[in-house]
Regions:
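Cysteine-nucleophile active-site neighborhood
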Residues: 51-120
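N-terminal beta1-alpha1 ligand-phosphate binding loop
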Residues: 6-28, 182-183
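Amide-donor transfer/coupling interface in amidating biosynthetic enzymes
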Residues: 71, 104-189
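Structural alpha-helical scaffold elements that stabilize or flank donor/cofactor-binding regions
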Residues: 38-39, 68, 168
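Short acidic low-complexity segments
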Residues: 30-41
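Extreme N-terminal starter segment of soluble prokaryotic enzymes
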Residues: 3-7, 173
Length: 189
């Protein structure tokens, strides 16, 4: 099943094995790699991420993966920090990110709610987007983050935590979700 082959880009974060396990469990054959040729020949790409934007960008740079990611033509999904890396800039360490779509990542403004934003929250998406096919409007997904991307023209879904923020973004073949699909049960699948 070539369709079910998933290539996870090794961003050097700690939780890669749990992401791989979750996708294996969904019936994908997931492989974690930092090999440029494997990434280029991949069927579907996953850009995971936990930790800081600065550390992740440094890891990608050291592995010469930045151009490889920017030039990818196959569908790529960024999760959590992986989604944040897809925009132009992160104020977390003031680091230029991959620039795959507009927007920047900022600390969630203090509205008296605890950070990180952690737990289940409702997601409202733009109707008709294939990423949310078969998912009910205002479904709940699992979030853990302190930084967020303000809604902009790349936003295809929002959630609210003291303010509206982008729960999902998309541009061409690049997709990002702020929530953790691998921890969101049936809707995450």
């Amino acid at each position: 099943h070539i369709m079910n082959k998933l290539t996870i880009i090794d961003t050097g974060c700690a939780n890669l094995s749990s992401v791989k396990f979750a996708f294996d469990h969904l019936g994908y054959r997931a492989e974690i790699t930092r090999d440029i040729h494997k990434i280029q020949s991949a069927n579907k790409l996953l850009l995971p991420g936990v930790g800081t934007a600065m550390a992740a960008m440094r890891n990608l740079q050291e592995r010469n993966l930045i151009d490889c990611i920017r030039n990818a033509t196959q569908p790529m999904l960024g999760i959590c920090l992986g989604m944040q890396l897809m925009t132009e800039f992160s104020t977390e360490g003031n680091v230029a990110t991959l620039g795959l779509m507009n927007g920047q990542t900022d600390l969630i403004p203090n509205s008296g709610l605890p950070l990180p934003h952690m737990g289940w929250n409702k997601v409202r998406y733009t109707p008709g987007h294939p990423l949310f096919a078969g998912i009910e409007q205002d479904s709940h997904f699992y979030f853990v983050h302190s930084y967020a991307i303000q809604p902009n023209e790349s936003t295809i879904a929002t959630s609210c935590y003291g303010m509206d923020f982008s729960a999902a973004i998309a541009n061409k073949n690049f997709y990002g979700v702020q929530f953790h699909p691998e921890r969101s049960g049936k809707n995450g699948a």
